[in-house]
Structure formats: C-alpha cells, structure tokens
From Swiss-Prot:
It comes from Marinomonas sp. (strain MWYL1). The chain crosses the membrane at residues 6-26. Composed of six subunits; NqrA, NqrB, NqrC, NqrD, NqrE and NqrF. InterPro entries: 2Fe-2S_ferredoxin-like_sf, 2Fe-2S_ferredoxin-type, Beta-grasp_dom_sf, Cbr1-like_FAD-bd_dom, FAD-bd_FR_type, FNR_nucleotide-bd, NqrF, OxRdtase_FAD/NAD-bd. Signal peptide: none annotated. Belongs to the NqrF family. This is Na(+)-translocating NADH-quinone reductase subunit F.
Length: 408
C-alpha cells in the first residue's frame, strides 16, 4: 500500500512538472519570436531575417547601416526610422526623443525595436550608400597627452565617398585591454604617470560600436583619419569603467584590423558666401581639419575663413605646422591658437585664456556683423556651451551655429 502511494505521488509530481513545462513552452512560443520574418524597406526592398533581435542590428546584418553614435544604447537617437507596421508600441526609452506627432507618424529608435513579426519600415535613401570595410591600422601615435591620431588604410581600391564634416562608425569586438600595454610616446607620459592611468583595465563582453568624425578631407583618399581622446575614469572615480571604444583604439597597433561603417553625417558646410568661423578644442580638431582643408585645398574657397583653437599648453596643440602653412598659402584664411594653461617651458607669447573669451575679445567684440557669419564648432561640452551662449548674446541666429557633438 505504501509503495502504491509513493508511485502515485511520483506520477502526480511528474505530471505536474510536465504540465508546467508545457505551459512554459507554450508561453515562450507566444512571447519569444522564432523563425524568419520579412522586413519591407521603403515599400520596395525586402529582406528575410531571423526574429528575436533588434531592428538596428537586423538591418545591419542585411547590409543596411543606420547611424548609431551610442552603439545601440538608445541615447543618441540617430538610428531613428519609421516603422509603419509590425513594430509594436513605442517604449518608454524612446518617448523622450519624439513628439506626439512623430509617434503618430511611426518614428522609432531602431535600436529599441524588437523584430518579432513581418515589418514595414522607412529609412533615409542615403542609408543605401553606407558601406562596411575591414581596415588596417596604418599608424596610431599620440598627438596630445590623451589624444591619438588613428589612421586606417582601406582595402585596395576602396574609398569612403564622404562630405567634409562627416563621420563613420568603428566596431570593436569583445576584448580586454590593459592600459599598461598602451604605446604612449615619452613626451606625453608625464600625466599618465602622475594620475597612474596605467592601472586601468577595460573589459568588454560584447561588440561595441561608436561614431567618430573624420579628420581627413575627401581628397585624402584610401584612408580614414581620426583624433580620438581616451575616456579614462576621472580622478577619484576609479570605480567607473574606462571608455570602451577609446580604450580599444588606444590599444591598436600598425597592422591591426578594425571594422568601419559609413559614411554618415549632417555637420556639413553651407553653400553660401558667408564668412566662416571655426571654433575647436581637444579632439574636436577632427571635423575642423576636414572642413578647413576641404574649403581651401579642394574647393579653393575665397570665403573669409578663420579658425580658433583652444588647448591647455603647447604639448596639447597639434597640426600647428599644417595650419601655419595654410595661412601662408591663403590670404583669406587665418588661425589662432589660445592656451588656457601655458607651461613655463612653452615660452608662450601668444593668446591665453579660454577660446570663447579669446574669440570674443580678439575678434567678435569689434566685428561689424557677427550675426552674418556662419559658426562651426566642435570641442568639449563646456566649450561648446560657452561659445553658443556668447553667439546668442551677439544675436547670431541658431541656423548659423553649427555644432558637431562627436569630437569633444
């Protein structure tokens, strides 16, 4: 009798477990999409892809690359597209980026949209011109204490057809990077030693994608060039992780491979005859160089152009000889370097202070019509904010203040 009760108990327990498993599998089948779905793009092109991923990556796997400066984190809002069917309801992570009208029209962040069923989406036509390359590191020296000039060589016969001020996306695989293994030239090692940056380790368990403005201009073919600043934890914040992509970039050596996607962009020069004033700082040098070289060397522009760049000290200023030469060769161009913290060894006799103050005191204060100029800027957030406020106080309209948020 006891044995029979035990057997019945085991049978009942097994039946309950099997029933629960069946319920879970049924629920999973309803909630987790499997199999392939069809995504119709712009009412014309169709791609078949496995369900379950995010729309941004699903499109990328099919060779359609939407811009995503934040690498799919839902913060930059550059991967927006229209999802007219099959996308479900807008998520709370998307709502701050769109108006109610945008939501009604179907705008979504593709990095937040799950691919669960057949979908209809609309993307900008220029997206179809975006390509992917596996590039080779040609060089990666420091040009300032915390900034590398990364030059990548494209595959033989390939070229990035971009406009000055454009950007591409770099992809880093999962990796572990030790700062102690970085190649930092002797003249720049002082602050690395002072702040003991060698102790940091960047460990990344998944693919990382970030956007960087190009420092080369369209006539410099066969390569892409960047000015990339290391994003190490601030002093006293050792518990914060280092920048994932910048740490990876600082570890790259000649001959290494890295994937590049692009081109993208919206920080383009206006086609007018207005005076152009460029303002930069830090790694914001990249799009400044691209624009200025394009205007003077490719377009042979006769517009009045000036460039105002801020750095801490002489050691942190780069491309100075290139700009000196441009100034000698072009009577319509002049450039000004201002140091906020010149060192005794600099023997600096030039302009000092923060670049927005120098620009105002040295030029805009007595300019007859600053509101008629076009201002292009890229630099650290505090610099950008200070320059924008100054320009607004001078009566410059927003459409004449162009900002690249990538280069700081």
């Amino acid at each position: 009798m006891v044995n029979l009760e035990i057997i019945l108990g085991v049978v009942m327990f097994t039946a309950i477990v099997l029933a629960l498993v069946a319920i879970i599998l049924a629920a999973r089948a309803r909630l987790v999409s499997t199999g392939d779905v069809t995504i119709r793009i712009n009412g014309e092109k169709e791609v078949t892809a496995p369900a379950g991923g995010k729309l941004l990556q699903t499109l990328a796997n099919s060779g359609i690359f939407l811009s995503s400066a934040c690498g799919g984190g839902g913060t930059c809002a550059q991967c927006k597209c229209k999802v007219t069917s099959g996308g479900g309801s807008m998520l709370s992570t998307e709502q701050s980026h769109f108006t109610r009208r945008d939501e009604k029209e179907g705008y979504r962040l593709s990095c937040q949209v799950s691919v669960k069923q057949d979908m209809d989406v609309e993307v900008p036509e220029e997206v179809f011109g975006v390509k992917a390359w596996e590039c080779t590191v040609e060089s990666n020296p420091n040009v300032a204490t915390f900034i590398k000039e990364l030059t990548l060589k494209l595959p033989e016969g390939e070229n990035v057809d971009f406009r000055a001020g454009g950007y591409v996306q770099l992809e880093a695989p999962a990796h572990t990077v030790n700062y102690k293994d970085f190649d930092i030239e002797e003249e720049y090692r002082g602050d690395w030693d002072k702040f003991n940056l060698w102790k940091f380790v960047s460990k990344v368990d998944e693919t990382v994608i970030r956007a960087y403005s190009m420092a080369n201009y369209p006539e410099e073919k066969g390569i892409v060039k960047f000015n990339i600043r290391i994003a190490s934890p601030p002093p006293g914040k050792d518990d914060l992780p280092p920048g994932q992509m910048s740490s990876y970039v600082f570890s790259l050596k000649p001959g290494d491979k890295i994937k590049v996607y692009g081109p993208f962009g919206e920080f383009f020069a206006k086609d007018t005859d207005a005076e152009m004033v460029f303002v930069g700082g830090g790694a914001g040098m990249a799009p400044m160089r691209s624009h200025i070289f394009d205007q003077l060397k490719r377009l042979n522009s006769k517009r009045k152009i000036s460039f105002w760049y801020g750095a801490r000290s002489v050691r942190e200023a780069f491309y100075t000889e290139e700009y000196d030469k441009l100034q000698e060769e072009n009577e319509n161009f002049e450039w000004h370097l201002a140091l906020s913290d010149p060192q005794p060894e600099d023997n600096w006799e030039g302009k000092t202070g923060f670049i927005h103050n120098v620009l105002y005191e040295s030029y805009l204060k007595d300019h007859p019509a600053p509101e008629d100029c076009e201002f292009y800027m890229c630099g650290p957030p505090m610099m950008n904010a200070s320059v924008i406020k100054m320009l607004e106080d001078l009566g410059v309209e927003k459409e004449n203040i162009l900002l690249d948020d990538f280069g700081g």
